[in-house]
């Protein structure tokens, strides 16, 4: 009799565990809290990363950032490329005149250019890549690819070889790609991104609209921007590789949506994604 009771008790425990296992996930889910799946569907999970990447293409901040972003832009770009191009002149005498504006390069200023044009957006790009693969949202990763190339082509043109084709991989040492390899990879990535977003644009779809501070999720405008970026890269390599340059220049110009041709196409950040941005040049 004692053994029979033990078997009954054991059977009851097993049955109870089966019922509780069925309800475990439901019982342990907060009905008032957003799940990961909901976050992806609404763009919350990657939306912040998209905005962060946009703010890193050309360093830009808000009032909440005080002058941090302005100072970063000044050191990374204004005291180097902006000045060397002849668009701006400086009225300060940093390092007793031995600074980038007099072609005496300061290591910390050069490092700031690399950090702001390459390193800053890497973590956001990796997050979008991982999430888009898990949730099968290639259109969001396509946007991230366009933003990445918008920033990294400046690094490539300023420093030469950069880690590109293996960037973001979990390895102790990431190899650098030659300029030719990096440019070709950028063309390939841009082509893939444009193809994906073109389909979405033809469907009239928007993506991460609440977090896109540039075009508010307008996929058609992103395609035109990406085509314009492709044309710009093609012109950059025209003397080094005329055949490749012609191929991608024609591809950009002959695309259904073409390139940017009017003021309404411009990619600028003044207000968007719930923020008001400061114009670095006005403050400098």
Language-model features: where?
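Hydrophobic alpha-helical elements and their junctions with loops/disorder across both membrane
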Residues: 18-19, 60, 200
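Membrane-proximal, proline-rich intrinsically disordered regions
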Residues: 22-85
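Intrinsically disordered, low-complexity, compositionally biased regions/tails
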Residues: 16, 32-34, 276-278
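Sec-dependent bacterial lipoprotein signal peptides
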Residues: 1-20
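Structured, solvent-exposed acidic/aromatic patches
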Residues: 40-44, 90-284
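Long, intrinsically disordered, low-complexity segments
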Residues: 20-24, 281-284
């Amino acid at each position: 009799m004692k053994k029979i009771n033990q078997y009954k008790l054991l059977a009851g425990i097993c049955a109870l565990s089966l019922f509780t296992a069925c309800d475990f996930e439901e019982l342990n889910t907060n009905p008032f809290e957003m799940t990961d799946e909901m976050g992806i569907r609404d763009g919350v999970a990657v939306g912040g990363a998209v905005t962060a990447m946009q703010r890193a293409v050309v360093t830009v901040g808000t009032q909440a950032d005080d002058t941090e972003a302005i100072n970063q832009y000044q050191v990374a770009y204004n005291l180097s490329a902006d000045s060397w191009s002849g668009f701006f002149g400086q009225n300060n005498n940093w390092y007793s005149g031995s600074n980038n504006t007099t072609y005496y390069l300061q290591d910390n200023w050069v490092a700031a250019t690399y950090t702001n044009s390459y390193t800053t957006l890497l973590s956001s790009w990796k997050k979008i890549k991982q999430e888009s693969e898990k949730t099968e949202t290639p259109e969001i990763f396509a946007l991230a690819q366009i933003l990445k190339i918008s920033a990294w082509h400046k690094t490539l043109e300023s420093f030469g070889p950069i880690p590109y084709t293996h960037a973001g991989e979990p390895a102790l040492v990431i190899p650098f790609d030659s300029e030719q390899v990096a440019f070709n990879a950028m063309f390939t990535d841009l082509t893939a991104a444009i193809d994906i977003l073109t389909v979405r644009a033809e469907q009239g779809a928007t993506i991460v609209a609440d977090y896109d501070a540039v075009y508010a999720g307008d996929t058609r405008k992103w395609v035109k921007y990406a085509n314009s970026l492709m044309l710009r890269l093609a012109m950059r390599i025209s003397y080094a590789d005329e055949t490749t340059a012609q191929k991608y220049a024609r591809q950009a110009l002959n695309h259904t949506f073409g390139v940017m041709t009017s003021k309404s196409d411009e990619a600028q950040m003044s207000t968007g994604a719930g923020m008001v941005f400061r114009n670095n040049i006005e403050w400098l």
